[in-house]
Amino acid sequence: MKIIIDGDGCAGRDIIEEVGKKHSVKILIYCTINHMINSDYSEVRMVDGGFQSVDMYVANNTEENDIVITQDYGVAAMALGKGALAISPRGYIYDNDNIDRLLFERHLSQKNRRAGGKSKGNHKRNKEDDDRLYYNLEVLIEKVKAILN
């Protein structure tokens, strides 16, 4: 088990590292060369700045029972397809019961924007998001530990 972070624009990294350290789980952060990320605990892997480069590195380096942290539903879907677990930086768990709906909603939003419509953005990150991320990341780690033991 390892935690893989889609690092471009990933809030909550300090919480993820705190939980990872607590459970001695290796953390890999993938980010483009345009984002300078430093960490005393995680291994930071810089990739080229091409379109969806980070997404492809995350997907290609995800294995069964890994935990992927991403706000991208497509990356989450690829992780789930490989037998990994996935969670958003706000602590929402992606699973086979909700990923199809999320992908469809994303498709509808993109279609609406192309037609000139507007979509509302995410709310500002708050303590509730931090608490949800901490708690649900703990839940996923314990779930993987139970599978591996």
UniProtKB/Swiss-Prot annotation:
Superkingdom of the source species: Bacteria
Signal peptide region: none
HAMAP family documented for this protein: UPF0178 (MF_00489)
Name recorded for this polypeptide: UPF0178 protein CPE2266
Taxonomic lineage of the native organism: Bacteria, Bacillati, Bacillota, Clostridia, Eubacteriales
Similarity annotation: Belongs to the UPF0178 family.
Transmembrane segments: none
Pfam family, one: DUF188
UniProt cross-references to InterPro entries, sorted A to Z: UPF0178
